[in-house]
């Protein structure tokens, strides 16, 4: 025999709402993965100089739950402390080989969260991801890239933003 428990709100011992139902099956839960953002290349032409580590500023916001990503600086500065999952991808629009491709996810423009390297390929997407603790006030993250193809090279702009992107979301406190 099955049991039925009916409630329109589930609270913890502190009286904080964990789960709420409107009675019609629509649930409201805590925003546990917020703040979050995801930006990509869409309509941008981004040129990266040869053999130079360059910050990539993506301006097409798909999601920015707390307005924590600044499209003018390329910085994500969440105002909620916690551990964040950070990810990014870079693809160059080039038909020749690279001697060196790099992607770097950085905290406060100093410590590297994650890096990836690739060599001697063209139309290669390089990805990086990792976790980082952010203090909820001054800590920020950015995405950087470096390419060595002998001359400046553009990031691929395939109009749907699936090749070049950067994002993060909170995974815990």
Task: Outline where the language-model segments fall.
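Short acidic/polar mixed-charge low-complexity motifs
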Residues: 15-17, 110-111
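Extracellular jelly-roll beta-sandwich "head" domains, especially the C-terminal globular C1q domain
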Residues: 4-5, 28-173
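Short acidic, Gly/Pro-enriched loop/turn segments at secondary-structure junctions
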Residues: 17-20, 152-153
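Assembly/interface hotspot detector across virion components, adhesins/toxins, and nucleic-acid enzymes
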Residues: 9, 19, 67-69
């Amino acid at each position: 025999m099955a049991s039925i428990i009916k409630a329109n709100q589930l609270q913890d011992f502190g009286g904080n709402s964990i789960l709420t139902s409107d009675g019609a099956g629509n649930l409201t839960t805590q925003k546990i993965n917020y703040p979050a953002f995801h930006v990509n290349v869409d309509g941008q032409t981004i040129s990266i100089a040869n053999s130079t580590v360059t910050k990539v500023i993506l301006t097409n916001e798909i999601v920015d739950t707390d307005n924590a990503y600044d499209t003018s600086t390329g910085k994500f500065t969440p105002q909620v402390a916690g551990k964040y999952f950070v990810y990014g991808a870079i693809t160059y629009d080039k038909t020749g080989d690279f001697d060196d491709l790099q992607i770097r996810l950085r905290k406060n423009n100093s410590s590297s969260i994650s890096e990836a390297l690739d060599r001697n390929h063209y139309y290669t997407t390089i990805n990086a991801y990792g976790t980082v603790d952010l203090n909820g006030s001054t800590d920020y993250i950015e995405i950087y890239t470096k390419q060595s193809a002998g001359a400046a090279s553009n990031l691929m702009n395939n109009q749907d933003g699936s090749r070049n992107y950067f994002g993060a979301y909170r995974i815990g406190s």
